[in-house]
């Protein structure tokens, strides 16, 4: 398998948010029915635990439909005192920007948000989205290499690529 190091990505994101003063950090994700979403969910829990932050099930929102889950969970997480939310994918974070704008919730003044993937559109949102970057070109090259190995009956292990945090304007103190 080929993938991005979710643990490293969430660790970078939580450290960044802690430097900004955040201590109640939530997660909004899709349902935990895929390997990637499970890995990102566990990476979130690991990062909170590593940095001594509260792990609270009320800080987590899991939902299949993107717009519906942001509409449902953003108010719930804010009522719980969450000041920053990590998202399993950039699309969910972009949906959150729209939802927050509709509710007059200012980003990053009222709520900091971080996505995951670094899709090209994230630098054009208002505000531009802070996100955990997966190097899509490197993922593609490694995927091609892994497929070539399999086709040639060469055994390989998992390939895990480094994550990086792209700091833009959706996070603040």
Question: For each predicted feature, which ranges?
Answer:
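Bacterial carbohydrate/catabolite-sensing allosteric modules
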Residues: 1-173
